[in-house]
């Protein structure tokens, strides 16, 4: 079974967008994916449900013991070709923001899942490698297995992917393009 957790250095990096894109791709390929969300969040699972047409499951290491979370995960994933978990907030951000307890990393560690790290290359290039290396070294094992770039232009991906692979030792698995939108009146645009 294909299984992994999608995480990011911080909120607003595009975890939900990439999780839904990966779920849709797995569904199109006949993998019958199931989805999970770290913590008690009910909003992101609604997006998962919209993509899959099935329930998304919450896995919360604050409200449940690790063994309970492992059992809930195994039961919900049984019979599926893929299981995709979406982390919350930053990768190591757990209880109160000052602990890794109940963080995305804690969930990956509890379930033994590889982690795909979503990174937005906004206003940074080589510094991204330093940040990723910091995430790799902060806890052992980090479970980081690959990088996905979000809001990335194709020419920037061609430049960043080889550098990030060389500097971090992690494969860069792909990217989602920056989606340009028309300015709205709320953005100060006038007609």
Question: What are these model-predicted stretches?
Answer:
Residues 180-185, 189:
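Conserved small/polar residues in nucleotide/adenosyl-binding loops
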